[in-house]
Amino acid sequence: MRFSVIKITLSGLCLLIFVAFVSAQSRHSVKGTADADGTILTVTASRTDNKTEPIKSENLFLYENGIEQKIKNFSYDPSPARIVLLVDNSQTLPTDIEKLKQATMEFAYEIFDGDQLFVVAYDEKPEIIQEWTDDAKKMETSLATFRKKGNPYLFDALNSTVSEILLPLMPGTRKTAVVVIGDGLDRGSKTPFDKILNELQNQNVVVYSLQIPDRTGGAYRRNQPKAREVINQLTEGTGGKIFPLEEASTAAKFICDELRKNRYLLSYFPANTSSYDARRVFIVADEGINIRTKSAQPPNIK
C-alpha cells in the first residue's frame, strides 16, 4: 500500500486551494446531515423464537454509560457487504499456507450477489493480494502469492485496511467488515491497539475472526493485550464473532448470511452524555431476539 507523490505547479496549486475550499463547504453540509440523522449504529439482530414479524425499535433498549437512549429509527439494511479478508502471513504462524488459502476461498463461495471481497496479507507490511472482486477464480489465482515470512504487524495492517481500503467507500457504504485470519499476535506495529480499536468502532466496521491457536501459548505482552485477548476485544468491541480456523466453511456461510440477512441501522440522539467522552454502548432486546453491536462510542476528538 503506497502513497503517491504529486508535483504541483503554481496553477495547480490555485486549483487545489479552490477545491479545498469547496470540499470544506461540502464537509460542513455532510456534517449537518449527520447531525440531523443523529448517531448511527450498525446492529446485528435475529429472531430465535420462530416468530415471523419484523424486529422493531419497540423491541429494543439502548443505553450509553448506563443511561437509556431514545431510539429514533431502526431499519433493515439490505445493501451489499464489503468484506476485507486480513490474513496473517508471518513466519511463525502455527498453520500452513494451504489451510490459509482454503479458509480464504470459503468466502468466495458464500457471498451474495453484490457483495465484494478484498484480500490483504500481512507480515511487517500489509500487501494487497486481491482488490475488490466477487470472482472466485480470480481470487484463487491471486492466493498463490501467500507465503510465510517475517513478524506479524497486525495493528498496522488493520490501520491501513481501514484508512486505505474501507474509508474511501464511506459514507455511501455502511456494511463493512474485516475478517482476521490469524492468532491476534502483533510484534512491532507502530499503531497502538487502543487506537485501531477506537477507529474500527468509530467507523462502524465489524470484525470477525477465524482464530488460530496463540503461537505464544498466552505469553504476557507488554503495552498490549495477549494475542487471544486481542481477537476477543476486536470482535466483541465491534459486534463481531470468533470461529476456529478449522470451521472456516461454517464461519464463511454464517458471516455472509448474517451480513445479508440480519444487519440493521439504528439511529438515536445521545442524551445526557458527551460526545467528547468515551461512551459504553449496551443494547438489549425482548426475549427471543439475539442482538449485537459495538461495545463503545469513542470520543469525538480529532
Model feature map: region roles:
Residues 25-29, 147, 157-159, 203, ...:
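Extended acidic, low-complexity intrinsically disordered regions
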Residues 39-46, 59-63, 72-73, 82-86, ...:
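Soluble periplasmic/extracytoplasmic beta-strand elements of cell-envelope proteins
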Residues 32-39, 223, 233, 245-302:
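C-terminal "exit" segments of structured domains
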Residues 105, 113, 123-218, 222-223, ...:
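Exposed acidic/Ser/Thr-rich ligand/metal-binding surfaces
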Residues 1-8:
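Positively charged n-region of N-terminal signal peptides that target proteins for export
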Residues 25-92, 101:
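Eukaryote-biased intrinsically disordered, low-complexity acidic regions enriched in Ser/Thr/Pro
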Residues 9-20:
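Bacterial N-terminal signal peptides
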Residues 74-81, 90-117, 132-138, 158:
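…and closely analogous acidic/polar surface helices at protein-protein or active-site interfaces
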